[in-house]
């Protein structure tokens, strides 16, 4: 019998969907190596491999059979995706054009040889970032530069603004995936994109207020408020928006600081200075990464208290998703302080979910973990923290939790989302 690869769903799926992988037609107990590869839009090659042994019927199902070694070991049905590593140092897998899929090649090789044995079977699978029927609408309204993703149908849908960090530009992959779950999601750029500022030393909340107004006025967006989804600097900005602006019902804060960092933030007659930092506190790891976790001043001490975001003004529901090994900044500390501050002012206690051995970039499911990555403000890659498997598990859980949270607070219901390792 000729070996064949079985993938479910067949042919294509959304990136955040689990993929069932099985091989049939092998010899009983046959040792094989499974290998995956994809290229991103910049030409970087991402690969993973794992060694397996077929069962007594010559079949191999990754949901039931543990890997014996390779890029990972143990029972990891999605390991061949989340364990991928780039052929370029410190290169993160980022989908830049969500209108095209990542094409994943899967090969089955005979034996457990490091360089691969005879090719037994091969399959190609497309991993899409826009579910069928999701619409992509570029937004250039007033000063707002963004892309709005709308689910199939007429709506109205609960609205979310999606914000990333200091890398700048316009990243759409999280918004496009989330639109497939029934949300109208606007990926919002705020610098280093189109005619927006090229630097981030000054930010005006009026720009973000304009984005909120635009989204709430859209005929396919359900009011009375919108949700915010932010990571890193985007999470910090989400907290500022929730504190100063109207129309924010719920906010998911992924590894964010409850203090204004790097830039000076202005809103009308008020301003928050950037928190002081000491670059001499940077440590360099044995691998040559910069560990910046200790460079920020403690915002609870004068004069740095002026940089604290006035969360007590907000009536927004908050969900903090925290990587406990985040080395970008002390995310768990900031989440705990936010909870204390909100409760001290009679506000609702926020949800805080902490993930052990999880680093800074908590992404949608199955996006590979990175130990370190370049940073706009440093000349060497900075340490992001985390461990591959724990980080992968955290991403699956966080993706489910944020959807449930938004459905609860923006739609008034609670829907589970199918995702698993």
Swiss-Prot record:
Pfam families: BAAT_C, Bile_Hydr_Trans. It catalyses: hexadecanoyl-CoA + H2O = hexadecanoate + CoA + H(+); decanoyl-CoA + H2O = decanoate + CoA + H(+); octanoyl-CoA + H2O = octanoate + CoA + H(+); dodecanoyl-CoA + H2O = dodecanoate + CoA + H(+). GO terms for molecular function: carboxylic ester hydrolase activity; fatty acyl-CoA hydrolase activity. Keywords: Fatty acid metabolism, Hydrolase, Lipid metabolism, Peroxisome, Serine esterase. One of its GO terms (cellular component) is peroxisome. GO terms for biological process: acyl-CoA metabolic process; long-chain fatty acid metabolic process; saturated monocarboxylic acid metabolic process; unsaturated monocarboxylic acid metabolic process; very long-chain fatty acid metabolic process. Its EC number is 3.1.2.2. It is an enzyme of class 3 (hydrolase). Pathway: Lipid metabolism; fatty acid metabolism. The keyword Transport does not apply. InterPro entries: AB_hydrolase_fold, Acyl-CoA_thioEstase_long-chain, BAAT_C, Thio_Ohase/aa_AcTrfase, Thio_Ohase/BAAT_N. The active site is at residues 232, 326, 360. Induction: In the liver and kidney, by peroxisome proliferator, via the peroxisome proliferator-activated receptors (PPARs) and by fasting. A motif (Microbody targeting signal) lies at residues 419-421. Signal peptide: none annotated. Catalyzes the hydrolysis of acyl-CoAs into free fatty acids and coenzyme A (CoASH), regulating their respective intracellular levels. Mainly active on medium-chain acyl-CoAs. Seems to be involved in intraperoxisomal regulation of acyl-CoA levels, but not CoASH levels. May have a function in termination of beta-oxidation of fatty acids. This is Acyl-coenzyme A thioesterase 5. It comes from Mus musculus (Mouse).
